[in-house]
Amino acid sequence: MTELKIKTAKVEKHLAKEPLKPVLKTPTQKIDSSGKFYATGKRKNAVARVWIKVGKGKIVVNKKTIDQYFPSETYVKTILRPFVLTNTIDQYDVICTVRGGGVSGQKGAILHGISKALDKSVPDFHTILRKGGLLTRDSRVVERKKYGQRKARKKTQFSKR
């Protein structure tokens, strides 16, 4: 007990001489040597690693064009939403790798990653993307199956007699 008092007294003396300065963490921009902005997006079990750079609007997903990777046009329109909101269609080239999950989860992960990378490239886009709901991660995941039940919430049939 006396050792603790001595240690706290030493700390207080040290703080009296030099008060603590607040450590401010500045956000580090993830930019590589070729000027690409990097961000990760997540949705369900899918994780997308996204790099964007100023270009002509070319989008590559897992070494395929976006039309080859997502045959449905609605998926492509959803992925292009950040560019539509910020009015930057055909101004950025996007390269992304996606792993895990299904097609819908991968679409959401790419959308989230592109939004975060656009936010890093031009900080003025932050409010636009935030209001559009594109910067928040959708945390809904599949609920686990419980033992003694058929599914996550479905129970076995109840028999009164």
Curated annotation (Swiss-Prot):
GO CC aspect terms: cytosolic small ribosomal subunit
Keywords linked to the UniProt accession: Ribonucleoprotein, Ribosomal protein
GO biological process: translation
InterPro entries found in the cross-reference section: Ribosomal_Su5_D2-typ_SF, Ribosomal_uS9, Ribosomal_uS9_bac/plastid, Ribosomal_uS9_CS, Ribsml_uS5_D2-typ_fold_subgr
A Gene Ontology molecular function term of the record: RNA binding
PROSITE patterns: RIBOSOMAL_S9
Keyword Ribonucleoprotein attached: yes
Pfam entry (one): Ribosomal_S9
Membership in a protein family: Belongs to the universal ribosomal protein uS9 family.
Protein name: Small ribosomal subunit protein uS9
Top-level taxonomy: Bacteria, Pseudomonadati, Pseudomonadota, Alphaproteobacteria, Rickettsiales
